[in-house]
Amino acid sequence: MSSAVMPPRRRVSKLFGAICFYVLAFGVAGYAVFAYGVMPLGALVHPDMKLNFIAHQAGIYTHVFASLVALTLSPFQFSGRLRSKRPQLHRLMGRIYLGVGVVIGGLSGLYMAAFAFGGWVGQLGFACLALGWLFTGLRAFQAIRSGAVQAHRNGWSAMFR
């Protein structure tokens, strides 16, 4: 529905949702850069968790920074303006999002799930989240490759529900 025919209340609601999405995505990304890029590893977590982070530095850094790529690209990928005015850029960013953010972030998350703080419940939750991202990313990629644009959009938006 275009904004010209969209009821004013719906436009405000949609704008509010978009602003919240951008603020949260960039806020979490900024925190991740600070917590894992500026501060010493594990400085902001429980001491036992810090030991776990230090024991698995490569896994934690790979997961955090690959997932950071997905987090910072996601608001732009949901932009209808970008999709319509710069489709090649949308596709390039989508490939980076999928290849780095979802595949590398998901696989490193699956690896890190074995060492997640919080016992088997934390480990299972972390593993399910990683598998969910990998599965949803694969389905969305398959959808766009087969020309199913709406299924592709639904797949990507499912990652943020």
Give a label for each model feature.
Residues 2-161:
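Alpha-helical membrane insertion/targeting regions
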